[in-house]
C-alpha cells in the first residue's frame, strides 16, 4: 500500500548510417503520484539534433531519466518540470515540440499553457494545438497540408482579422498545386505579441486562444 508504479515506453527513429533522416520519437510515461490511485499519462515528442546515432541514444536516455525524476519531484511546478527535462544535455541537442500531461492529479493543468512554456523556455520554436484545446505535434498535423497562416495579436480577434483571412484564403485557393481539401488555416501568436512589459500573462494567453 506504500508503492507507486510507473510504466515507461518510447518509439524512436534515430539517425541512420547515411544520415538521410532526422532522429525523432515519442516518449510516454504512465505513473502514480500516490499509492493505490488511478494513473496519470505524460506523452512528449522529441526531435534529436545530434549528428551521431550513439549521441542521440544517450540523449534520449538522459531525457527519459529526467522525465521520470521531474514528474515525481517537480509536478507541483509545471515550468520547473519542463526546464528539468533537459538537465545534463547541452543546448540544442534535443527539441521537445509537444507535451501532453493528463490524469487525476493534473486536472487543473491546461496543456496549452505547457505548450507555451515549451516555447518560452527555448525547448522548441513553436507549439500547436487544435480548436478543441488538445495539443498537436506540428509535423504530424501539417503533413502534406497547404498552410495558410494569419499572424496577429488577437486581443480580441477583429473583423479586420477575419476579412484578411477571408481574402487571403480566396487568393490562396487560386494558387497552382493547391489542393483545396488539404488547406489548413492557422492562427499564429508570437511570444512578443503575448508579452506585456516583458511578462506573459497566462490568463491573457488563454483568453486569446479561446
Please report, for each region that a protein language model flagged, where it lies by residue:
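Nucleotidyltransferase catalytic core that binds NTPs
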Residues: 1-210
